[in-house]
């Protein structure tokens, strides 16, 4: 139900970013819309006359007579249904009226009257309260400029309200997504990824919604017949001028809606890129853990093989080795060699498997550059026994803090220094 508040606006109208509109409303009287219960036999709407005054608040009309008086069909009323089911945005031009269905606004615009249908949603009711105030002010305004047609002023008020809602929602989503993306740059957390998924779904819904509105406005701009028919009260000889005025009006809000589409699409692309990078990092960490587990398993197997022979010799059975002078040394040497041999052979097999994996990840027919890159990755992740010995000796002799550089790296560093000096 619609009530007139004679003092300041209800604070609930200032929710979800309508602070700018509410600041205007706080200076004078405002509307407060309550959601209604749908009825299959009647339509409930608020009526504005040609002077912008409210002549009916939540007034109920029988559906059949409402359609018959305006030359509409039952299928036209489905687009203006007050149910919570969202319909594709549309502006349908009829001989005697214009049917508007944009987001939370469902209205019928005639040449001297506007019918704004009530809603069943509390959130949409708050937004309709802002529309009522703007619509009353716009329809009742009189200026020294050339008079704008009544139906065009009503349509402009509706488009302004729709674009304001889109702008508010996009700013909210952009802020939330930006915070999550900045946090993911510092640390990858499961809760942050869940928040990013939720915000991504909301942003995708906003993108689809704004895209449908933009395409609808584009279709209207492409149809000269609809532009001419949107002038419900044309003066003689001014049809072309009125059509041009409507075209300029729709084109202005088309560009604004297209801006929201482009910005939301760019933000969605950034989210997708971030998700791809996060997946790559998680895959790399998973592969590192698997490689570490394989290395631990190989070392454990080598240690087990090395202790197998001493375990046999340590049984309380006569084997005559304890009487030999070389028994202890021989068993120790054979065990160490067996353990190293098993470890080296397993690392060689792991290196071959890793080489095939890296080579296949580059391309079906890898070139010399890919082969060199694969070899570098193998030397870093799965070094050979000789490379391990060299690394251990270098660490013992020079210390771990000394970086290892070959001649090519030294020449490259000197080249960088000379280039910087010449600049």
Swiss-Prot record:
Motif (CGMN): 313-316
Residue runs in coiled coils: none
Compartment list: Mitochondrion inner membrane
TM spans (from-to): 289-309, 324-344
Presequence positions on this chain: 1-25
Subunit structure: Homopentamer. Forms homooligomers. Interacts with MFM1.
Protein name, entry field: Mitochondrial inner membrane magnesium transporter MRS2
Organism of this sequence: Eremothecium gossypii (strain ATCC 10895 / CBS 109.51 / FGSC 9923 / NRRL Y-1056)
Gene name of the record: MRS2
């Amino acid at each position: 139900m619609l009530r007139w508040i004679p003092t300041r606006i209800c604070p609930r109208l200032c929710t979800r970013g309508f602070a700018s509109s509410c600041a205007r409303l706080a200076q004078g009287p405002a509307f407060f819309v309550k959601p209604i219960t749908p009825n299959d036999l009647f339509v409930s709407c608020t009526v504005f006359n040609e002077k912008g005054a409210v002549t009916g608040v939540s007034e109920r009309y029988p559906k059949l007579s409402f359609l018959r008086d305006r030359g509409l069909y039952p299928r036209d009323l489905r687009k203006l249904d007050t149910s919570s089911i969202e319909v594709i945005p549309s502006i349908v031009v009829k001989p005697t009226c214009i049917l508007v269905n944009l987001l939370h606004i469902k209205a019928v615009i005639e040449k001297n009257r506007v019918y704004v249908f009530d809603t069943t949603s509390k959130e949409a009711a708050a937004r309709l309260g802002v529309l009522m105030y703007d619509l009353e002010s716009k329809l009742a305004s009189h200026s020294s400029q050339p008079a704008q047609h009544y139906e065009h002023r009503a349509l402009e008020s509706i488009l302004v309200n729709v674009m304001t809602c889109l702008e508010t929602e996009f700013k909210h989503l952009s802020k939330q997504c930006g915070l999550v993306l900045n946090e993911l740059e510092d640390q990858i957390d499961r809760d942050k990824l869940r928040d990013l998924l939720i915000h991504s779904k909301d942003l995708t819904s906003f993108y689809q919604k704004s895209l449908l509105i933009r395409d609808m406005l584009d279709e209207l701009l492409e149809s000269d017949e609809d532009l001419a028919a949107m002038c419900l009260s044309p003066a003689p000889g001014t049809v072309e001028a009125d059509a041009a005025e409507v075209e300029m009006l729709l084109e202005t809000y088309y560009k604004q809606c297209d801006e929201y589409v482009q910005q939301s699409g760019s933000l969605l692309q950034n989210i997708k890129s971030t998700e791809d990078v996060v997946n790559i990092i998680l895959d790399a960490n998973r592969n590192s853990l698997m490689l570490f587990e394989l290395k631990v398993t190989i070392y454990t197997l080598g240690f087990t093989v090395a202790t197998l022979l001493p375990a046999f010799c340590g049984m309380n059975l006569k084997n005559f080795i304890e009487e030999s002078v070389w028994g202890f040394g021989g068993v120790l040497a054979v065990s160490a060699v067996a353990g190293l041999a098993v470890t080296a052979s397993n690392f060689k097999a792991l290196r071959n498997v890793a080489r095939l994996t890296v080579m296949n990840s580059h391309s079906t027919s890898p070139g010399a550059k890919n082969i060199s890159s694969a070899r570098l990755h193998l030397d870093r992740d799965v070094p050979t026994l000789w490379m391990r010995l060299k690394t251990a000796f270098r660490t013992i002799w020079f210390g771990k803090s000394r970086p290892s550089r070959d001649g090519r790296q030294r020449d490259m560093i000197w080249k960088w220094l000379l280039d910087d000096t010449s600049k």
